[in-house]
Amino acid sequence: MPQSQVATASPSQNAQPNHGMGSKVLSSDPNASLPPQTAYYASPLHANSVSLPPSHLPRSTLHPLLSQQQQPAQQSPSLGPAQQNIQQPPSVSIASQPHYAEAIVPIQQVLQPQQYRQLPPNMVAATNAPQQHPQLQRMMPILSSNQPIQQLPLPNQASPYIPVPLQQQQQSQPQQQPQQQQHQQPQQPQPPQQPLQQQQQQRQLHSGIQQPVSTIVSQNGTYYSIPAVNHPMAGQPIAIAPVPAPNQAALPPIPPQALPANGTPNTLASPVTLPAANSAVQNAQPVPMTSSPAMAVVPQNKTAATSTLAAQQGANVLPPNAPESVRHLISLNEETWIQIGRLAELFDDQDKALSAYESALRQNPYSIPAMLQIATILRNREQFPLAIEYYQTILDCDPKQGEIWSALGHCYLMQDDLSRAYSAYRQALYHLKDPKDPKLWYGIGILYDRYGSHEHAEEAFMQCLRMDPNFEKVNEIYFRLGIIYKQQHKFAQSLELFRHILDNPPKPLTVLDIYFQIGHVYEQRKEYKLAKEAYERVLAETPNHAKVLQQLGWLCHQQSSSFTNQDLAIQYLTKSLEADDTDAQSWYLIGRCYVAQQKYNKAYEAYQQAVYRDGRNPTFWCSIGVLYYQINQYQDALDAYSRAIRLNPYISEVWYDLGTLYESCHNQISDALDAYQRAAELDPTNPHIKARLQLLRGPNNEQHKIVNAPPSNVPNVQTAKYINQPGVPYSNVPVAQLSGNWQPPHLPQAQLPSATGQSGVVQQPYQTQPSVTNNNVATQPVIASTVPVQTAAPSSQTAVPQTIHQSNAFTPRGKHASGSRNSISSTKSPQHKLSDQPRSRNNSISNVSHRERSNSVSSKSRETRTSASNESDPKKSTQRDSSKKLENSTVVSGSPSSSSKSDAAKSIKPQKPEPALKPVEGTADPKSTKRNHQETEKTADTDVSSTEPVKRQKTADVNDDVGEEEVKQSVSEQVDSAQLTSEPKSESLPKSPEEKSDDTSNDVTTENTNDINGDSNMDNVATVDKSTDAVDTSTATVAATTTTAEEELPQKESQERSSPSPENQDSTPLAPKSVSPKQAARTLDIDENYDDDEGEKETVSV
């Protein structure tokens, strides 16, 4: 239709009626004789006011706006204005509305696929009163089949739907009632015409908002215009069809002669059923639909607002008075889209399937089958939050669907929300008619496994296998059961299951993964040779596998294995670090190997690297505490133990080590008993903890305050465990399964130190995620997929063996070459261990931790040492001079700078624990001792005091050991507990170098001061009286005899009673070397003061 004809219809340009339009009126009814009526236009339009069509409608399918409704009539010739006025029916109100039956034909009879219908807004809402619906004026334009169709916008709110001149002309001329057609209703009185303002308000009320576009639908040459309203959810326009009044019924189908040429009625492309806008008239809510899927797209990211909308609107989105044909059409469209989606799933086209299901939701936003299929696709894509939203929406509509509860529980499990997963599984068991669903029990088994309840997890998995022996996940269940049996120390059953799935491992695991698990089981059984063979078979396929190299390095570190080799172990671990230098466990194990080789500086550096990468691992801090203990830095050891306890207070070994520290340093027997009692609560089956408690609680416990240390020979009574690190991404390479109780295998009995106790089972594993304990499965277990759990799968972190420290690895087996000394080195008590330990600070952590202020040689210590050596043993003077030259000339290679030392100390230094170590009664005041040291250091030689201590010559240590071996003193009952307990209290504060005297207490104090300053063993010489020598030598002898086997103890004591002579007692240089309580207390005082100084330095720097 030419645009000029449209422009002439505007009242602003042409106030006269358009007589040319009358010649284009047609009627589809051959018997109709109704004359044409005046043209009816929606709004004034200018010649250039034709708007572009909306994006969802093709331009070729649009036509000019014809807001009139067609009346079936034959095509009549064009009439003039006079004939048109005469033939108009009288008393027809232009503003009145027609009945539904007169305004629109049934929706299922809409035929032409590229034509649309449209009604004016004042016809959208139908009232209950039939008299308010007069006959609508209709026109039938002539449109050729090849004529282009255009879309025009609806008028704005301020324009009338009928031009004012036409309204006046129609009101002034009498109108004639036309003859009723086949579907014509009886004539009813019309209300008076409403004012223009009321009409505008009514249109705004019915439409809600201004309509941007309109839709035109045609059937059999009749055009209907329906205004468009905004989408209630997405803000997009949708068309609204009128609803008949309650007293009106749907029209019958169109007879066959009225069908189009092809004879098949076509439905709308994709009608949408969404909640309609609120109508002012009761029982007149329109049925929402759209002509294009793009007009009402359901968002893919379904949010909680959809669930709220579902609860408010309900599943039934159609009004109660909607025609049955509309309901049927919507249902057919919904089922069709669902079938299309299922067909796309058969072709493995998930995107098309998802789009089809969303189209079904546009037909019915609360279609349970469509939402269920969408949720399943999202769950398979691991988009669990979106899947949870869809499942929750389904359960809002029907909360009794047990299958949906089961799927929801799985999604919660994958999100690591165990409490909600547990609740969902309970609801599933309650609502399912038959709870014997293998997938349900498979998920429940994974849930129990994540909770750490291995017994319940085992029962759930066995129930799943009994319900369906051919379950699709049967091999994965066998794998999980093998892991559970390994954690329960049922190694035979675990090996049987792993061998059963060796030929058919669950995907994506491979045969190498199963061999790795088999090797780990052999390692737990202490069959190290078979474990090494299994690991080497994996390493043959993956030569640079970090975890396999790590496990092989740890096997070579084991002293009980036949292939023990610390150098080879370090080589394996170094290769593991080359493959993955971010693994903290490899650094930790290298540190253990260096400690076994007594390379304490390198061990400290390795521990520091491990702490940098995993600072919240209590195992690392426990090992650092043992290292500090061995180099006599007791305050640092206490800090490290306290940090480990704060991270995980359920490690019995840490409490045992803490009790050893309290007992050895200050004789704090009450604190030691508390620590031992805590360790016994965590590990009640440990016989060594019980024996230590009985010894300290016995009637003669005062006798063992100094001499008796923790059990010297502590065997490994517990199997190795690993500590889990959850949340590691899955890997296809073989890695050992790490449960919550997994720990690296321990060292042999011969290397276990008496200071720290045995390796035991961790009752509460260390965790990095607080939500789950004993995390034994993957972070995202899969119920319906084939991906096995992550715990079974090898990963780059879960296979890291983390030990609860076994201090046996850190005890030096003796640096001395004498054969008699080697018999005691592996079983000596802490007192003998500390006495044998060289005092040279280059063997300690102090070089790295920047503690040169107390380790430097002071003038007081050198003067006192010189006087004491001259008085007691002139032979030691020459050795002292040589050692002094070494101190001034030799520097330890590889020691870090002072700044790096300070940073290293700050990086690992924890806060001081409670209770702090208490000084022994009768010892020197820490503050006064510090003042004396400071005054003495002021007079020290600058070159000598600033020189870093160096390692002593090995020959000097050998000479000391030979001298100690020659000492065979008799232990008499006269020098028992009375002398041991009274001697420390008789000592007095150290005097200044100027106040030299010959009394024994000053000499003993000077000796202890020399020990504090950290000089070599040969410098620890003092002149004591006869009674003091007897006490010291008896103390050393008792400490040595307690470290030997029980059956040899009586014989040794008898031999030692008869062997020593007075000359040996007087000449022994190592008798005072056993660390007395006073010496330990003073050492700690210096450390505590240093901590205060460091704190002040940090405050000033800030």
Swiss-Prot record:
UniProt modified residues of type Phosphoserine: S893, S895, S897, S898, S992, S1059, S1061
Keyword flag DNA-binding: no
Subcellular location: Cytoplasm; Nucleus
Region spans: Disordered: 1-94, 166-209, 739-764, 808-1102
Annotated disulfide bonds: none
Domain of life: Eukaryota
Xref: SUPFAM superfamilies: TPR-like (SSF48452)
Gene3D superfamilies listed in its UniProt record: Tetratricopeptide repeat domain
PROSITE patterns linked: TPR (PS50005), TPR_REGION (PS50293)
InterPro entries linked: Corepressor-Demethylase, TPR-like_helical_dom_sf, TPR_rpt
Extent of Low complexity compositional bias: 64-84, 166-187, 195-205, 889-907, 1021-1044
GO cellular component annotations of the record: chromatin; Cyc8(Ssn6)-Tup1 general repressor complex; cytoplasm; nucleus; transcription repressor complex
Short name of one Pfam family: TPR_8
GO biological process, one term: negative regulation of transcription by RNA polymerase II
TPR repeats: 334-367, 368-401, 402-435, 438-471, 475-508, 512-545, 584-617, 618-651, 652-686
Chief location bin: cytoplasm
Positions with biased composition (Acidic residues): 1086-1096
MF-aspect GO terms: chromatin DNA binding; RNA polymerase II cis-regulatory region sequence-specific DNA binding; transcription corepressor activity
Keyword Repressor belongs to the record: yes
Comp. bias intervals (Basic and acidic residues): 849-865, 872-887, 932-941, 984-999
Subunit field text: Associates independently with tup11 and tup12 to form ssn6-tup corepressor complexes.
Function, in words: Acts as a component of the ssn6-tup corepressor complexes, which are involved in the repression of many genes in a wide variety of physiological processes. May also be involved in the derepression of at least some target genes. The complex is recruited to target genes by interaction with DNA-bound transcriptional repressors.
Record-stated family: Belongs to the CYC8/SSN6 family.
Record-given protein name: General transcriptional corepressor ssn6
Lineage: Eukaryota, Fungi, Dikarya, Ascomycota, Taphrinomycotina
